[in-house]
Amino acid sequence: MRFLLFFLVFNISNFISAQISNNDENIYDSLFVKWNDTFLTPKNTALNLVCPKIDTVRIAVIGLGNRGMMAIERLPQIPTIKIVAIADIDSNKVNKALRSLHDTQFDLPKPYYEKNDWKLICQRNDIDLIYVCTHWELHTPIAIYAMEHDKHVAVEVPAALTVDECWQLVKTAEKTRKHCIQLENCMYDFFELTALNMVQNNLLGEVVHVEGAYIHDLRSLNFSNTYYWNNWRLKRLQQTNGNTYPTHGLGPLAHLLNIHRGDKMSHLVSMSSDQFGLTKYANDQLKDSDNWKGNKFEKGDMNTTLIKTANGKTIMLQHDVTSPRPYSRLFTVSGTDGFIQKYPKPTIALEPKAHFSFSSKQIDSIMTVYEPKTIKEIKEKALKVGGHGGMDFIMDYRLIYCLNNGLPLDQDVYDAAEWSSIIELSKKSVRSGSKTVKIPDFTRNNWNVLNKVSYYLK
């Protein structure tokens, strides 16, 4: 590996040409592995959970807001699914979804319009997967009810809002032996997937520190009276502090660090700035008659959370949806032999010349070599179908592929619980003056049963 690093730095053009000419096999694809029964885990856990194959996955989409409508447009591009039910309390959105599906699916799904119709959907016996895209407060209740009625669940982020809800998800998934995952699309960003494969090939040596974020100026959308139903997202900023949306930044880093697959998050400290931006925006942009003008918001503009793992690694997470600045998830990875960062621009630096980043052309070449073969095979379609640059389609594709073939899913219920728990735990630390807060081990001492993150193939 040291020779490879040296060769990459000083003779990268020849290195890339040699690897690209080897079309038979991507010898650097460590992330996607063929499943076999030696990967089975104890029956009392949901680690590497295996369920019967489903040839055609019958899906109910609950919640047809922004994410739900995008799913309605993407999912029919996968031939082994059928949407059999859709639900939203806004009849206009239901009818819009039906019109969209009329062009992509022969049999239209049964529409549901009432507030509690999600329970009727979960009670049906002709549904395999409940795809939850509602506002956050309904994520856990629907997921629990669905699993209790023999359904797999894919729930938008965050999967839960409290540690207690996280435990409910874990215990229900273990008891019912049903998949329960978050629809964390950032796991499938081309750069982040390739970086994960690079780390698994030891290109950076031992990873020591990582940084992630959700930095996204949402002021105009949050104060819109139409974009988020009933201003549910703005109300969260009014009512709570800490990191209220951690999973986009944390998810890819957690897999990169093999969290609950050889390491675990141990404890955190969290600190928030005071709140300035929302008040200023409301005063500057809203009409005097707007009900939100003059409101107080608990959420500080910038939250920074530091996490320590059992193996001595550190994670920095940031959350800011109120500042006028470019979008960023940071995605910074620092190891003993090199460095990767996506934002503000892709950067790769490796020993022995790590003081300098490779050029953009060289970075593209490195990414070409280490992009997993499985992703290369579906990349063209993913880019065509779209969804945040294609990562949403890859997320759906991998979910359905694993259900079709009876494989463990790329994410599991412990991921959902660990990443979502940061919401309440960071809030607790902020309120205590940034005292240390312990992070629960949702696997209950099974965090080192597996030794790495793997995405499985048949």
Question: Where on the chain are the PLM-derived regions?
Answer:
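Active-site beta-strand termini and strand-to-loop segments that position acidic
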Residues: 305-311, 335
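C-terminal helical cap and adjacent loop that interface with cofactors, partners, or active-site loops
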Residues: 20-42, 47, 70, 324-458
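Bacterial Sec-dependent N-terminal signal peptides
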Residues: 1-21
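N-terminal glycine-/serine-/threonine-rich beta1-alpha1-beta2 phosphate-ribose binding loop
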Residues: 19-149, 167, 171-179
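Predominantly a Rossmann-like dinucleotide-binding segment in NAD(P)-dependent oxidoreductases
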Residues: 176-181, 186-297
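ADP-ribose/adenylate-binding Rossmann-like module
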Residues: 150-162
